């Protein structure tokens, strides 16, 4: 088996990459137009309160307007989502992480959309760039510093 180890690892890595890419392509969405979330119970982080009956409009992956239900003009052709009073929170940050390819979907499932990697190995930034593409699901990663290679 030792003679085959390198080939086996390469095949395992290739299979895992294909699985991650298939998962990302099946679950990732990039809306072409505006997205409107209506009737949300919005968490206001500046006032530390919930704002019931709130509409939030997103365009090009950014929040472009927030207001009470019925107070904002809805862009033509926008995808509309009825939050039905459910809570709407901003994406959460985890400021002390050591992410890897397998942890990406777990962060997102927990509402964590951005992380800071506290001690990246020299090859880790390139490895985790797949989160910015459709190759793997994961949060935005900010690197605090990189461990110097020897």
Regions found by a protein language model. Name each.
Residues 1-39, 73:
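Extracellular/periplasmic ectodomains of large secreted or surface enzymes and adhesion receptors
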Residues 39-40, 61:
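Solvent-exposed loop/turn tips at the surfaces of repeat/solenoid architectures
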């Amino acid at each position: 088996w030792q003679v085959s180890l390198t080939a086996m690892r390469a095949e395992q890595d290739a299979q895992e990459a294909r699985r991650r890419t298939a998962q990302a392509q099946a679950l990732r969405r990039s809306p072409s137009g505006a997205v409107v979330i209506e009737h949300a119970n919005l968490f206001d982080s500046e006032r530390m309160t919930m704002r019931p009956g709130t509409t939030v409009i997103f365009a090009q992956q950014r929040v472009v307007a927030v207001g009470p239900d019925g107070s904002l003009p809805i862009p033509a052709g926008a995808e509309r989502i009825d939050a039905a009073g459910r809570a709407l929170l901003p994406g959460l940050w985890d400021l002390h992480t050591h992410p890897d390819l397998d942890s990406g979907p777990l962060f997102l499932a927990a509402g964590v959309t951005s992380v800071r990697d506290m001690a990246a190995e020299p090859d880790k930034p390139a490895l985790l760039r797949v989160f910015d593409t459709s190759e793997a699901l994961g949060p935005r990663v900010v690197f605090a510093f990189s461990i110097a290679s020897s």
